[in-house]
Amino acid sequence: MFPLSLLQPSHSPLCPCSQPALTLFGQLEDKNLGDNDLERRMQSVNEVCQLLFQDMDISRIRDQIRQPGAPESEGTSPNTGKDGKDPGNSL
Protein backbone atom coordinates (compact mmCIF):
# COMPACT_ATOMS: atom_id res chain seq x y z
CA MET A 1 0.00 0.00 0.00
CA PHE A 2 0.92 3.65 -0.13
CA PRO A 3 2.59 5.30 2.83
CA LEU A 4 0.18 7.37 4.86
CA SER A 5 2.07 10.55 4.02
CA LEU A 6 1.19 10.14 0.32
CA LEU A 7 -2.50 9.82 1.06
CA GLN A 8 -2.70 12.94 3.19
CA PRO A 9 -2.92 16.38 1.58
CA SER A 10 0.40 18.05 1.03
CA HIS A 11 0.88 21.55 2.38
CA SER A 12 4.33 21.92 0.90
CA PRO A 13 5.07 25.18 -0.94
CA LEU A 14 6.65 23.04 -3.68
CA CYS A 15 3.30 21.46 -4.58
CA PRO A 16 1.42 23.62 -7.11
CA CYS A 17 -1.87 21.79 -6.52
CA SER A 18 -4.46 23.47 -4.35
CA GLN A 19 -6.08 20.06 -3.73
CA PRO A 20 -4.42 16.71 -3.17
CA ALA A 21 -3.83 14.73 -6.35
CA LEU A 22 -5.88 11.79 -5.08
CA THR A 23 -8.90 14.04 -4.60
CA LEU A 24 -8.58 15.40 -8.14
CA PHE A 25 -8.22 11.93 -9.60
CA GLY A 26 -11.15 10.75 -7.52
CA GLN A 27 -13.33 13.57 -8.86
CA LEU A 28 -12.25 12.80 -12.41
CA GLU A 29 -12.98 9.11 -11.91
CA ASP A 30 -16.41 9.90 -10.42
CA LYS A 31 -17.20 12.14 -13.38
CA ASN A 32 -16.11 9.48 -15.88
CA LEU A 33 -18.13 6.80 -14.08
CA GLY A 34 -21.13 9.13 -14.03
CA ASP A 35 -20.75 9.84 -17.76
CA ASN A 36 -20.47 6.12 -18.52
CA ASP A 37 -23.53 5.39 -16.40
CA LEU A 38 -25.50 8.14 -18.15
CA GLU A 39 -24.43 6.85 -21.56
CA ARG A 40 -25.46 3.30 -20.60
CA ARG A 41 -28.87 4.54 -19.43
CA MET A 42 -29.37 6.54 -22.63
CA GLN A 43 -28.55 3.45 -24.67
CA SER A 44 -31.16 1.47 -22.74
CA VAL A 45 -33.78 4.18 -23.31
CA ASN A 46 -32.96 4.27 -27.04
CA GLU A 47 -33.29 0.48 -27.28
CA VAL A 48 -36.67 0.59 -25.53
CA CYS A 49 -37.87 3.35 -27.88
CA GLN A 50 -36.78 1.36 -30.93
CA LEU A 51 -38.63 -1.72 -29.67
CA LEU A 52 -41.77 0.32 -28.98
CA PHE A 53 -41.69 1.90 -32.44
CA GLN A 54 -41.19 -1.53 -34.03
CA ASP A 55 -44.14 -2.87 -32.05
CA MET A 56 -46.28 0.12 -33.09
CA ASP A 57 -45.29 -0.42 -36.74
CA ILE A 58 -46.15 -4.12 -36.55
CA SER A 59 -49.52 -3.32 -34.93
CA ARG A 60 -50.26 -0.68 -37.58
CA ILE A 61 -49.37 -3.08 -40.40
CA ARG A 62 -51.47 -5.84 -38.82
CA ASP A 63 -54.44 -3.43 -38.54
CA GLN A 64 -54.01 -2.35 -42.17
CA ILE A 65 -54.02 -5.98 -43.28
CA ARG A 66 -57.24 -6.65 -41.35
CA GLN A 67 -59.07 -3.44 -42.34
CA PRO A 68 -59.25 -3.61 -46.16
CA GLY A 69 -61.86 -6.41 -46.03
CA ALA A 70 -64.05 -4.65 -43.45
CA PRO A 71 -65.20 -1.56 -45.44
CA GLU A 72 -66.35 -3.68 -48.40
CA SER A 73 -68.84 -5.63 -46.31
CA GLU A 74 -70.04 -2.89 -43.98
CA GLY A 75 -73.05 -3.99 -41.98
CA THR A 76 -73.50 -7.30 -43.79
CA SER A 77 -72.01 -10.68 -43.20
CA PRO A 78 -71.40 -13.18 -46.01
CA ASN A 79 -74.33 -15.32 -44.76
CA THR A 80 -77.03 -12.61 -44.94
CA GLY A 81 -79.59 -12.48 -47.70
CA LYS A 82 -80.91 -9.47 -49.65
CA ASP A 83 -83.25 -8.47 -46.85
CA GLY A 84 -80.41 -8.50 -44.27
CA LYS A 85 -81.63 -11.64 -42.49
CA ASP A 86 -79.59 -14.78 -42.10
CA PRO A 87 -81.27 -17.49 -44.22
CA GLY A 88 -80.02 -20.29 -41.95
CA ASN A 89 -81.85 -18.90 -38.90
CA SER A 90 -85.28 -18.33 -40.44
CA LEU A 91 -88.14 -20.30 -38.92
Swiss-Prot record:
Residues 62-91 are annotated as: Disordered. Keywords: Stress response. Residues 82-91 have a biased composition (Basic and acidic residues). Belongs to the small heat shock protein (HSP20) family. This is Heat shock protein 30E.
